[in-house]
């Protein structure tokens, strides 16, 4: 979804606590990454801010793959069974199942019930799982695979349409038969958060450290982020390329320290715990640490609490903070449905990614009607959507389009600060212009042809 999307080798096994939203000064204290929803989940098929997307109907026989008289088979890609980080993206099938149960209770898509096919690539089986989906599934919705590049030609060849949870590699970002609800492309990136930190830490960003796992699917978006940071005033003095799986972060932390890095976007795009511990052990104190949105969870909060010598730790996000769910009816509905249909499952931003994809898909599929439910129809309706924010779950996007027709990302972002007692919305750092978001065309960085060529060569 985010055009700088990373491998998300991080999952917290901690149960998510009830959250309280406390307004004080310029920040909103979030005691957890989830909230108790106070609204009663509707069984009418109406989603707040999106409208009626599920309802009874005639269904009917169809010659379209994956579409039956009373059912629609949908693939949900993930990497949950991998042995490097077990449980990776397990939220995607969990959220998909919860959404399907909610939608089916309201009558389904014009009378057809959604059937979820869990397509678990376990990191290294993207091609095999896509091949399996090509046999029986109508479309792929609300999922993603960290190493997605091998899946692209297979999916395109069989015409498996996709409304993705997220994409990583350039090949996947630009793929056909796909709508990305986040508007990702390869020649631009929403990066206003780098600029926000440039204003707050003008000296520190002149010695920045970044990095990415040594595989094209991750190097490409992170190199894109490097170019964007430099366009926003950062000077990158060290860019590390560790292997995808790192057991000991001490040597990498020491290299950042030796290079005098004072503004840090870590090469660790997985679990922050060992990286934070390595920083504490080394006595490394840059001016701040900036993390991607995938770190917005209780484990990161615990890491900060367990390592009190860490500098300020920030998270950039384009998703409504789950702990503020009560402030946004669409997010509150998501949390309510997860509590009802996926009891005990932790909720994090992956659930939001999945949800906004499912909401777009259901809205488009319902618009097609029972007799015209085809991949082309669904994608055309999704691609024609304007002012999309999934009812407020994600930062707003003016218009969507097919992924191979130059979509544009949202110009909006928000900043969170990780503190020992909670993750707080940092209003002062965000400088919001619209709701909680900082929305400005200048937040979107356009890459040069030379930069794009360098990324494509990785």
Regions found by a protein language model. Give the residues of each.
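N-terminal secretory signal peptides that target proteins for export/translocation
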Residues: 1-9
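Extracytoplasmic ligand/sensor domains, especially the bilobed periplasmic-binding protein
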Residues: 137-240, 288-314
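N-terminal extracellular/periplasmic Venus flytrap/periplasmic-binding protein-like
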Residues: 38-133
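C-terminal region of N-terminal signal peptides and the immediate post-cleavage residues
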Residues: 23-46
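Beta-alpha junction/loop-to-helix N-cap segments that form part of ligand/metal-binding clefts
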Residues: 12, 87-94, 105-176, 242-249
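Sec-dependent N-terminal signal peptides
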Residues: 10-26
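Extracellular/periplasmic periplasmic-binding protein-like sensory domains
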Residues: 183, 279-356, 436, 440-443, ...
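Segments of small-molecule ligand-sensing domains
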Residues: 340-351, 362-425
